[in-house]
Each structure stands twice: as structure tokens, then as C-alpha cells.
């Protein structure tokens, strides 16, 4: 799965949860706090991604996510382990 596909899914999740986020290829490297994504928002996004893709994030890795690029990379890694 490509970066833009995962980012699109994150955008869909954010929109469905009424998060007011401006997510695109330009903002993917901005710190989460600059995007106004707090820990509860991130938890909600992560749970939705886990359900959508049938993956499970490691809690320690989640604690180290600094931006959406980190999240997308982790999704890609988990999907690769799953053979997707």
C-alpha cells in the first residue's frame, strides 16, 4: 500500500470523527501538535486503522510517533509483515 493511500484513509477517518485537520503530503512531516492532533485524537485514529487494516500497533512504537509520516510508515511496516 502506498503512502498516499494510507494518508487518504487517515483523512477519511479524521473526517468521519469530525476532526478539523488539514492533512496532505505537505503536512505529513509536521509535528502532531502543530496539526492539533492530541493523544485522544491519535488513539481514535490508531484504533480505526487497526480495525480497517486488521493490524495491531505496538504501544511503545505509538509513544514515539512524532508526525503523520511516522504513523504512515508504521502502518506500511505492519501491512508488509501481514503480507499486504
Curated annotation (Swiss-Prot):
The keyword Lipid metabolism applies. It comes from the Bacteria. One of its GO terms (cellular component) is membrane. One of its GO terms (biological process) is lipid A biosynthetic process. Keywords: Fatty acid biosynthesis, Fatty acid metabolism, Lipid biosynthesis, Lipid metabolism, Phosphopantetheine, Phosphoprotein. Pathway: Lipid metabolism; fatty acid biosynthesis. GO terms for molecular function: acyl binding; acyl carrier activity. 4'-phosphopantetheine is transferred from CoA to a specific serine of the apo-ACP-like protein. The modification O-(pantetheine 4'-phosphoryl)serine is found at residue 39. Residues 4-79 form the Carrier domain. Carrier of the growing fatty acid chain in fatty acid biosynthesis. This is Acyl carrier protein homolog.
Amino acid at each position: 500500500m502506498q503512502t498516499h493511500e494510507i494518508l487518504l484513509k487517515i483523512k477519511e477517518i479524521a473526517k468521519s470523527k469530525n476532526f478539523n485537520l488539514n492533512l496532505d503530503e505537505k503536512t505529513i512531516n509536521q509535528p502532531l501538535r502543530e496539526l492539533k492532533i492530541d493523544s485522544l485524537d491519535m488513539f481514535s485514529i490508531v484504533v480505526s486503522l487497526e480495525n480497517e487494516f486488521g493490524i495491531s500497533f505496538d504501544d511503545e512504537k505509538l509513544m514515539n510517533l512524532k508526525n503523520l509520516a511516522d504513523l504512515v510508515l508504521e502502518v506500511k511496516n505492519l501491512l508488509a509483515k501481514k503480507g499486504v
